[in-house]
Amino acid sequence: ELQQLSKQYSNIKLLQLDVVCENSIKKVVKEVEEIVGDKGLNCLINNAGINVLASLEEVTAETMLTIYETNTVAQLMVSKAFLPLLRKAAQLSTGMGCHRAAIINMSSLAASMQLVQANEMFLKVYPYRIAKTALNMITRCLAADLKSDGILCISLHPGWLQTDMGGNMAPMQVQEAIPGILSVLDRLGEKENGSFLDWQGETLPW
């Protein structure tokens, strides 16, 4: 589907990235820099993620570390690598938001510590939800650290979607969530910096 879109729209550039490979990250940063030039990068969406079903009885240290590396550590390393391009974009505008410079970390409702009991269906995904909770802390740290640069950072729950990871039991198709997600991104401003939002723009509890 992406290849078809890139053929239809010349402004869509497809780049391959392995988020857990430092050399791959460096390569993609250079490729993006060649595309955006002096304008910098306005919006980085950290969307990579993996999941393995693992209850308390099934979870292993190896599984925990594998999920944590991809869903948490890699998001921070990718954000760090793209900082020069984000800062370059931030210098060309004012205010806060995707129109200037923003980091969007794709999180999950499963990461909410306050809603653990309300979301018992997620209890069998220890590695995933713990990694996403840690990702939310990265969001908070980046939001505070980069505020002076004019770079916004939020965590976004896109909804439970029918994807390879979400499965066929998910209540929504990707096409249903995209308009809401784009609307949320378009409305982001300083007051949303460091927040945890869902695809409808509602604030979620940490």
Residue ranges and their predicted role:
Residues 2, 25-29, 166:
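A conserved hydrophobic alpha-helix of the Rossmann-fold in NAD(P)-dependent oxidoreductases
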Residues 148, 155-158, 167-206:
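C-terminal helical subdomain
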Residues 50, 55-68, 73, 83, ...:
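Catalytic loop of short-chain dehydrogenase/reductase
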